[in-house]
Swiss-Prot record:
Native source species: Leifsonia xyli subsp. xyli (strain CTCB07)
Subunit organization: Part of the 50S ribosomal subunit; part of the 5S rRNA/L5/L18/L25 subcomplex. Contacts the 5S and 23S rRNAs.
HAMAP family, sorted: Ribosomal_uL18_B (MF_01337_B)
A Gene Ontology BP annotation from the UniProt entry: translation
The family this protein is said to belong to: Belongs to the universal ribosomal protein uL18 family.
High-level lineage: Bacteria, Bacillati, Actinomycetota, Actinomycetes, Micrococcales
Name of the molecule in the record: Large ribosomal subunit protein uL18
InterPro entries membership: Ribosomal_uL18_bac-type, Ribosomal_uL18_bac/euk
Amino acid sequence: MALLGTRGKSKAAARGRRHTRLRKKIVGTELRPRLVVTRSARHVFVQVVDDAQGRTLASASTMEADLRGFDGDKTAKARKVGELVAERAKSAGVEAVVFDRGGSQYAGRVAAVAEGAREGGLNL
């Protein structure tokens, strides 16, 4: 894993420090994989990762064709992505996950993904 500017004072450096601190504590297993949220200025990407095998079990993002036509703000789209990844994870046999916010603050779109995943039936 690349360290993202751990020595600077910028927002990106602070996010990198938070991410490395989180990854020391959060590990996805086969029974409880990691729900990884990656956020850009425009899109949200979510993956369910089993760290023991190094495999992605399910994924969803706002760049998918069925979500591009979805009306609403970025937070509403993020909630929809959470519901979609929960549906795909359940079809892959995953019931519970560990939430990895990726160094981002648990607010806004990141929190909306978690709420959508809970509504979709995943246990966070």
